[in-house]
Design a protein with these regions (language model features):
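Short, Lys/Arg-enriched N-terminal segments with co-localized hydrophobic residues
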Residues: 7-25
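A short beta-loop-alpha structural element at the N-terminal edge
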Residues: 27-40
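Active-site rim helix/loop that mediates acceptor-substrate recognition in acyltransferases
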Residues: 41, 48-96
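Conserved glycine-rich acetyl-CoA-binding loop
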Residues: 84, 102, 115-126, 138, ...
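A conserved beta-turn-beta hairpin within the catalytic core of GNAT-like acetyltransferases
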Residues: 94-108, 119
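Conserved acetyl-CoA-binding loop-helix of GNAT-fold acetyltransferases
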Residues: 109, 114, 120-133, 144-145
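Conserved active-site alpha-helix within GNAT-family acetyltransferase domains
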Residues: 137-141, 147-171
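Acidic/histidine-enriched, glycine/proline-rich intrinsically disordered or flexible terminal extensions
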Residues: 185-236
Length: 236
């Protein structure tokens, strides 16, 4: 069982009792520092390589995101386990527009990354829940993300159609999930979602960036087909 202490600087200190080994793990969630940049990009690369496509682009997105006007540094967190950075989460601003043209600034997160050898231990969920709490403290009222529902419903995300949040042509992607940070804030209207331009990745530049790094083997994985099916699916 973890015991969490928070302060007003966006830092969490978590003590997790080991059940099968001696001692106690100390886990910090803190804002990313400039000295973390290359390490975080490497963590992201290792976490996503061959997950959705042969190779990945998420580490390049991290690389360019920090310099974009929609990046939110206050919601840029890393997770340290016993002094070692093993995961991170980053946020950008996004926008909802209702049928009358009224706009609402919201947030989206991603990538959220954990080193492969530390995955499926709840660390990603810790990053998500810590950052969502901080986003609410900063006054943001809703979060829209794209991802596998099984990874996010336990953190309170629901199908976008339940909140009448759609993309162009009024479609409701199965992978688009919504969480209200202010209950009822999306009630009574149909919303069209737009993410930040930084999310439109130049695949050529992403490949050049990947080629500049230590070589990793690109290969096909069964999960890539699952991702394709989910990304092409819509809720009626």
């Amino acid at each position: 069982m973890g015991r969490i202490k928070n302060n007003n600087k966006g830092l969490s200190l978590v003590f997790i009792d080991r059940e099968e080994t001696e001692g106690t793990m100390m886990l910090y969630i803190r804002n990313e520092k400039e000295t973390d940049y290359k390490l975080v990009e490497d963590i992201t690369r290792k976490a996503f390589y061959n997950m959705y496509i042969p190779g990945c682009v998420e580490h390049y997105l991290v690389h360019i995101m920090r310099g974009h006007e929609d990046f939110i540094p206050e919601l840029d967190f890393v997770l340290e386990l016993d002094g070692k950075v093993i995961g991170n989460i980053m946020y950008t601003k996004a926008e909802l527009t209702d049928e009358e043209g009224s706009k609402k600034e919201i947030v989206t997160f991603g990538p959220v990354s954990v080193l492969p050898e530390y995955q499926r231990n709840g660390y990603g969920k810790m990053l998500i829940e810590h950052s969502l709490n901080r986003a609410a403290e900063l006054g943001y009222e809703a979060v829209v993300i794209f991802g596998s529902p099984s990874n996010y419903v336990s953190s309170g995300f629901k199908c976008c159609k339940k909140y009448n949040v759609c993309v162009e042509k009024g479609k409701y992607p199965a992978a688009m999930l919504v969480k209200e940070l202010k209950p009822g804030v999306l009630d009574g209207r149909i919303w069209f979602y737009s993410d930040s331009p930084v999310m439109s990745i130049d695949e050529g530049k992403a490949q050049e960036f990947d080629d500049s790094l230590e070589k990793m083997e690109k290969r096909w994985m069964p999960g890539q087909e699952e991702f394709y099916i989910m990304s092409q699916s819509f809720v009626e």
